[in-house]
């Protein structure tokens, strides 16, 4: 089986070679192309190219029809009719040029006859800078040189090395571009001063060139191997006593070391003679990662430096921290007794930390008392306490590593925004480039000279995931009124920026919101509640998630329209505020269903609308439309009713129009204790007017009351008699017991009934006329038996007389004396006399009080 496969392979190779030979032969079967003087010429030389046809290879055996054409690549340069063609070509460029001869028997077809390649080149230049090198003690010798310009021809380079004792080593380079050769021999270190000579020869078709001989010794050409097994050791873990160690070849006498912190670009260089693989370093920084490299040389003056060793990266030991922390704080009131103090500090730099910071020690102490001290140890860069609002407090923060602690940074806790005169003015924040935010402000006017330092702080405006956003700050000298924020800032995030001006323990501040980049929010606010309050609605909403706000929100818009309405919605634009997330709207009509939604706006545009909510205002109509008329009517009514005359007339009208069933029950004086003990005098007995006037002197304060009967023609008038014992206003009179005789006489002798007659004299208060006899009175002195009822005894002096009084005297003797009194007459001229029906009755034995009505000076029977 193996023999069969081998035989097939050889047969295939033979067939391929036969085809190639036949193709070679068949290329120029119609003619030949010759080149004179050579196929290889130097630059600028001329060449003669000839093309001839072989016998019986022309066009139909007629030579006049043969047209030979010479092409240079694909461009026609010469043609001639006949069996041959000859042309001289000059100005050929460097490199190889192809010429092709073709036969044209017609204008449509050309037959290839043969072709030739002409190479144009130059004589090789003399090789320069021949140098040889041997890598390590056991390496081989390799030499390199500069070839010079390109010959554009195949050029062979030969390296020859001659040594002591007529030793010669030679090697030729077969590559087209050859500039180095490895002889594959090792020069022994036993004879470091022995001389060697190297020479390079270049040969091509146009000529030969040789380099100058290069002579060297073993020390000149040997290049030690790079050091290896590099390590560093520090005694007692102290950075001040660190030793770098490595391994080298035995012939090395000189070393050079370079090292640097990994974050630095410049190297520190150190030379070490006869170091024997170790060197002490005294200027290393603590807790710093360094990169170390070492190179070697076999001789102080001669020889070559080895390549740099592989880098060793290691961290030096720690040392106690140096420097002080940059501490900042925030103060927030919780209630009237407590406040919250939040301390923040920045990390120390690597050069200041000098080790891994394990924790921070924080102390908060009341300055005045000195006994209230709070201490804590934390690994974070912030701490928060709740302390009383009274007293002056100070804080101290220090950092600690495994070797010790830094000096504490002490600050006094003051109101950072308490001094209004120190507040910076015209604060602005604008993007600067693509990654920076430029904050500018102006000095605080009168307090500018007192400013010792500016502090610019910024933090994300919105909480993410319920966590407090980190606080960042920068300090600026008092002569600067701008700063560039580039750390801890991201695009499409809104930041609250505050500028503090500090002067001792006082400070003033101003704030603004800013963003690095912004675009329209991705979603709108979510309305979570709509409530009705006093004829208006209160809309409450949830904040847009921070990752969807896409910058600082400038305004909110509330849209509303009637449900199922195609009209344009109304809107209300609200400036952004952190809290509360609610706003009233008082322009909605009651009992109309509205659809409401909200959007948010940044400087880049408006967000999509949020959720829709329907609401119908169920409150009463707008009460404000009734307030003004009600106030006017009330003022007019109060003004009119302040006039007594008008008030009395209106009251009488209301009494006349009032239905009988709603009449007020009037107390009956006849049922009183006084009426039972002291019955009224008999009506038929006539009182002697002369005796009555003699016994009644003029009262000190007469209070006449006119009682008018509402009749078309008759108005009875009663006159109040004067009596020295008449009680003052508001006093009660003690009744007198009547004798049995008078009582019996009154009951048994009723007078004949008669009508009341009008009287032109002054009116008398009817209730004050009513009286009783004294217990010691006699029939001959009836006037002395009368006791006047006070006006205050009745429920009201403007109401009716009691309706259930037993009787009134059916007639009264006329009183004609001119008494000193104050007449009062009220005319009901606003009502026609026939509007009220006159009361007609027949006088019987008694006149009941339920037939008599009194009010505002009028008596109606």
From Swiss-Prot:
A motif (Box 1 motif) lies at residues 662-670. One of its GO terms (molecular function) is cytokine receptor activity. Residues 126-224, 226-317, 318-415, 423-520, 521-620 form the Fibronectin type-III domain. Residues 718-761 are annotated as: Disordered. It comes from the Eukaryota. The modification Phosphotyrosine is found at residue 800. Gene3D superfamilies: Immunoglobulins. GO terms for cellular component: external side of plasma membrane; receptor complex. The chain crosses the membrane at residues 623-643. Residues 24-622 are extracellular. Keywords: Disulfide bond, Glycoprotein, Membrane, Phosphoprotein, Receptor, Repeat, Signal, Transmembrane, Transmembrane helix. The keyword tRNA processing does not apply. Glycans are attached at residues 48, 129, 166, 271, 347, 376, 480. Residues 1-23 form the signal peptide. A motif (WSXWS motif) lies at residues 305-309. It is found in: Membrane. Receptor for interleukin-12. This subunit is the signaling component coupling to the JAK2/STAT4 pathway. Belongs to the type I cytokine receptor family. Type 2 subfamily. Heterodimer/heterooligomer; disulfide-linked. The functional high affinity IL12 receptor is composed of I12RB1 and IL12RB2. Il12RB2 binds JAK2 (via its N-terminal) through a membrane-proximal region of the cytoplasmic domain. PANTHER family: INTERLEUKIN-27 RECEPTOR SUBUNIT ALPHA. The WSXWS motif appears to be necessary for proper protein folding and thereby efficient intracellular transport and cell-surface receptor binding. The box 1 motif is required for JAK interaction and/or activation. This is Interleukin-12 receptor subunit beta-2. It comes from Sus scrofa (Pig).
